[in-house]
């Protein structure tokens, strides 16, 4: 556990961010070193051509057929804070408006339509998950809802809404969070802000509240009926804590505004940028002049397991409240819960950030995984393999590649990259399914600028080796190999959940579930690499699963305890 808030090496590392020339430390055996000339920027969406306003988050749909070059075959779905869901259509290069929300947003608020994630089986069900601010006579909340697009993915059916999760808030927050991302297991990760404004320096009712979903990273497993289950190994497992004092959805607590998050697609390590205080310090004193420069702190955080990341008692490399023991934080007596249900008085141990950042606004990018099997003429080279990329909303062209230790506890190198590529107010930075990088540049609060855009960063060099291949996520790999026989599509069974399957096929496949008597229970069809859930296998017993694709057929014997 990283629990020392007086470790000077952290600050020294953060201050030394530009010690090396761009890309100079990123090498790969058998390939030439990278230069700025190896990368090209393609503008997909721009303010001038497409009349976008306050773009926020994006999600991708790969249209390339197996074996086909993925370049130019990725649809980009994105949200605009003031209420529009839009899509860059890669076939026409046009920007479509799929739907529009009539939102109630305070004048100084950062609330609105924020996060977006496409369902793991989006190809067949056309489900899209959205994070937005909802207000009615009886409810003010952040909603995570599932909607259905039409068959052409050109229109959002507003009547199809299934409210998956509703988080009570006050209206007018400047810290909404809003990031959504599915992992390979079908779990949905959600970054929620602490629902405060900059002057609310000490929010006991949200970030440190174990019984509240604000100021957290949540992990849930959406189900076809619009409800969700709780994955194994969240922070507060059922039965371990006093009833009514914790929420099982919480994976990470003690965050201020986890505005961006990403997941290592293999190890499922969670990384996020936590936006730190800039209006007041933790004791409510104004931060201005020289004090702002010395007190301001951001965090790049990494979690290999659930935990408490300390806010508001700790921020960056600083303890911000006297008398709080990081090994056993206790909510101060007489604290005001502001009408929200109180949680535990004694909190899990506080974990220090892996990278305190004394700059402006921490935005995480992806942990990149090179895939030698991906046919893409624009995918990033293996020089970035397993690197964690980050940027800064307020720092023009500040982009860095972090090298992580094998256990994910330390950053061993931080190298500047893309120094000549315009990262203008980035609010989302992801690796697309084509292996290229995508960046959303914000327009400014209730304003527009010439730099408002969504860009794609293409690699134009010639380093595209066959190895490494994209590794299979750990739990899927453990389930595979001992589960069945035959040459059919690769299939992994995810333990400890509903019957959830990760299928990898070169084309169209079919799945059939039977009981031991041969009675058909369920069937599904899909194409390529997909995640499939079979709700029909709900009770304990032994089942047979038949999988057929272009590779052949195989049968698996499954035991449900």
Where are each of the predicted segments found?
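C-terminal tail/sorting-segment detector
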Residues: 523-525, 530, 537-561
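Residue-level detector of functionally pivotal "anchor" positions at catalytic/ligand-binding pockets or at interdomain
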Residues: 462-505
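Acidic, Gly/Ser/Thr-rich repeat motifs that build Ca2+-stabilized beta-propeller blades
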Residues: 25-199, 260-272, 276-279, 359-407, ...
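Short beta-strand/loop motifs in extracellular/secreted proteins, especially
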Residues: 397-400, 507-511
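Beta-propeller domain segments
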Residues: 26-34, 69-72, 111-113, 194-416, ...
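Short, glycine-anchored, charge-dense loop/turn motifs used at functional sites
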Residues: 186, 435, 514-521, 543
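Bacterial N-terminal signal peptides that target proteins for export
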Residues: 2-10
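Bacterial N-terminal signal peptides
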Residues: 9-20
